[in-house]
A protein has these predicted regions:
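Extended soluble regions of mature proteins
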Residues: 20-256
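Bacterial Sec-dependent N-terminal signal peptides
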Residues: 1-24, 256
């Protein structure tokens, strides 16, 4: 009997050790960000141009005939136990020529998960903004729904951000870092998928690699022209008003 209990104890120890070693603490994730251009451009024209409905219909028919439906771009998220760094896979990434909103096309987001400090680099037309503030706080509601993303079992969570915008996120609790793409964070594990249905935006992991990380930093952190998030939003609002671009989707996408 003593040998039986010893054997069971050893098996449990091995099992717990295997489970413990399966947790990922640092690595690199490749994300695909997709924007439905057909919907975004149609809403842009409706909100900013004042075209009659028939003209909008004809315009969009021509646009759809000559443009791909989705704008897809690729970003890498590097992470360890205390930091996440999200930036374009291609540092020379450009926005599509057939898309009217040259904003947020090569965002960079560095989050310090210990101090809850965030440093972001964002684009609006030909201007780049450098923003330093606390990380976004999101009130998530966890669900029981599960799905596989890039080989990881992920649990669904829902939230409202910017007062009324519905967000669906999927997180993997076997990746211990509580980060995610863009400024999304705050779930019990790494966020591998984000869907924003009303804004027609998705961000999903394509590959996840475990690897050791050196210190995660951005060279732009040393700049002096750094804004708070509130000041950044105020400047964006003023810029869009000057161009008569009171477009709600654009405001959200710039600050996402």
């Amino acid at each position: 009997m003593r040998y039986f209990f010893l054997t069971v104890s050893l098996l449990l120890s091995v099992q717990l050790s295997a489970q413990h070693s399966s947790f990922m603490r640092s690595g690199k994730i490749l994300f695909e960000r997709s924007v439905n251009k057909y919907t975004a451009v149609e809403n842009f024209v409706r909100e900013t141009s004042g075209l009659p409905a028939n003209d909008i219909y004809n315009y969009m028919q021509a646009f759809r005939a000559g443009a791909a439906q989705f704008w897809t771009s690729y970003f890498e998220l590097r992470f360890d136990s205390t930091h996440t760094l999200y930036q374009p896979q291609d540092p020379n990434l450009k926005y599509p020529d057939d898309f009217y909103v040259p904003v947020a096309y090569k965002n960079k987001v560095l989050n310090n998960l210990t101090s809850r400090e965030s440093f972001t680099v964002r684009q609006a037309f030909d201007k780049t903004f450098y923003v330093k503030d606390t990380m976004r706080h999101i009130r998530w509601k966890l669900t029981e729904e599960m799905r596989d993303i890039a080989g990881h079992q992920c649990r669904r969570a829902n939230a409202l951000i910017a007062d009324s915008i519905y967000v669906i996120a999927w997180y993997a609790d076997d990746i211990l870092t509580k980060g995610g793409p863009e400024s999304f964070n705050g779930l019990p594990g790494m966020i591998l998928g984000v869907a924003i249905p009303h804004e027609h935006i998705t961000i999903f992991a394509q590959q996840v690699q475990e690897e050791a990380m050196t210190t995660l930093t951005l060279p732009e952190q040393s700049r002096e022209d750094v804004l708070t998030h509130a000041t950044f939003l105020a400047q964006i609002k003023k810029m869009l008003a000057q161009f008569r671009l009171n477009y709600s989707w654009m405001k959200f996408f710039i600050a996402m």
